[in-house]
């Protein structure tokens, strides 16, 4: 009896740039052999807006409102690194109160970033409910930002060279503490819903595994790196702002799969709440209303008017010149290492403004992870990376 031999030709498939699970305008050219992924080629650049070139034609004061559009899920980190680079190069001192306020805003942004990752990732896996839950919590962060900065999600335009744009308003500290008390039980609720769910575990455990050596060699950072067994967090390594004043731990896992990346991010939300509570408790001068009362009671030229109790050190003029020299400044964003390589030329405009986006580097490993996997695992692996195309394409 003769057997018929069937041969299948590899199929080339386009995913994106309008696919709902692409997390922006990312296009993947997939080569498939049946259900198996043979090759993957990411096509980026659909959201390129020339952010580095724009920076070379704007003063630092003018450029801060632009930067929220890089990683539009976490705009505060972009603002932080945008002012940190000129501060380091020009030797601008930042008051301790301003530094504490910055840390509070950055950690709120880290929580918001991880919440916005959590919802769509679970939707990619097949769980729709948490997608709506996380917006409830994120809305409260928006309200806090709106009270402090005047804007909700992006374009807060809050960070300044030498400090922040305005002090925290009346009652803001109490509202922030209320949010911290509210969030922790909700994170526990997420964990009860998701972490031990057998369907979720089978979708993510052992999928998209990255070894410690691979994570380092590919230049990964953030939860992608820490989930592969590398204890590397720039808040501990670089000692920037005032993170050394607080008691908190670097969260990490060793498995390196999608589940490990999920666990790291969930734990980081708890650590962020821990940092926010300590920053509010140790805020120099206390809440704004208390600080105002102390200043009025002590009269002019009191200790409460000292440098460390200001929200900004010295307001820089619109003609603030970036000194001649070069520097690399970086912060630990929700996605990893966000860096700026700045070249100054004793001019109001920078000579070069190079952006090192965390998710641009993290996206590089996706084709390597997808080869040999099933089609159903594509969106799970991509979702676990946490990619925002505004930051990748810039």
Curated annotation (Swiss-Prot):
SUPFAM superfamilies: HydB/Nqo4-like (SSF56762). Its EC number is 7.1.1.-. It catalyses: a plastoquinone + NADH + (n+1) H(+)(in) = a plastoquinol + NAD(+) + n H(+)(out); a plastoquinone + NADPH + (n+1) H(+)(in) = a plastoquinol + NADP(+) + n H(+)(out). Gene3D superfamilies: Cytochrome-c3 Hydrogenase, chain B. One of its GO terms (molecular function) is quinone binding. GO terms for cellular component: plasma membrane-derived thylakoid membrane. It is an enzyme of class 7 (translocase). Keywords: Membrane, NAD, NADP, Plastoquinone, Quinone, Thylakoid, Translocase, Transport. InterPro entries: NADH_Q_OxRdtase_suD, NADH_UbQ_OxRdtase_49kDa_CS, NDH1_su_D/H, NiFe-Hase_large. Its main location: membrane. It is found in: Cellular thylakoid membrane. The keyword Ion transport does not apply. It is a peripheral membrane protein. The keyword Nucleotidyltransferase does not apply. GO terms for biological process: photosynthesis, light reaction. It holds the Pfam family Complex1_49kDa. NDH-1 shuttles electrons from an unknown electron donor, via FMN and iron-sulfur (Fe-S) centers, to quinones in the respiratory and/or the photosynthetic chain. The immediate electron acceptor for the enzyme in this species is believed to be plastoquinone. Couples the redox reaction to proton translocation, and thus conserves the redox energy in a proton gradient. Cyanobacterial NDH-1 also plays a role in inorganic carbon-concentration. NCBIfam families: NuoD, PRK06075.1, PRK07415.1. NDH-1 can be composed of about 15 different subunits; different subcomplexes with different compositions have been identified which probably have different functions. Belongs to the complex I 49 kDa subunit family. This is NAD(P)H-quinone oxidoreductase subunit H.
